[in-house]
Amino acid sequence: MRPLDRKIYLASKSPRRRELLRQIGVEFELLMLRNDTVRGPDVTEDAYEGESPADYVARVANEKAEFAWNMVHQRRMKIRPVLAADTTVTIDGEILGKPGSQAEAIAMLEKLSGRTHQVLTSVAVHFTDLSEQFTQVSDVRFAKLSAASIKAYCATSEPYDKAGG
């Protein structure tokens, strides 16, 4: 009997997700979905009109997992579970994605400063004919940030790879 392959595919660019899996001892192979020539219009990170933040983050995580699962089959890769996740920040009903510019990052952080917002993370796992998904919502209270500290932070590379900066 062959030993069970305990490795998974991680369909995420997030350095934080990779670090979390390493911390708990999960072996993974990274699947890059962005800039992939087979990636079609099946995964959009744009929120649909009227889509709630919870529905949005769950849909994106599920679409990433489904796309990655299909990619594994198309490329005839070893069959392993595929894990995908998405995180978004919401305040006043507005979904805040990753800032695309320094001005956008500053505006997001000014909006969050001194207020409570929600961070939603949805995780989706696809394997053979099984699919599992869950979403976690956390309330986060930001301290009041000075304009100088926001500007200094936004001058680094830190805010540009995460929702809400």
Feature locations, PLM:
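N-terminal beta1-alpha1 ligand-phosphate binding loop
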Residues: 2-27
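A short beta-strand-loop structural module common to alpha/beta enzyme folds
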Residues: 27-39
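A short small-residue
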Residues: 36-48
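Cofactor-binding loop segments of dinucleotide-utilizing enzymes, especially the Rossmann-like FAD-
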Residues: 13, 33, 128
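Anionic-ligand binding patches
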Residues: 2-6, 22, 47-165
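Surface-exposed, flexible loop/turn segments at secondary-structure boundaries
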Residues: 16, 36-38, 131
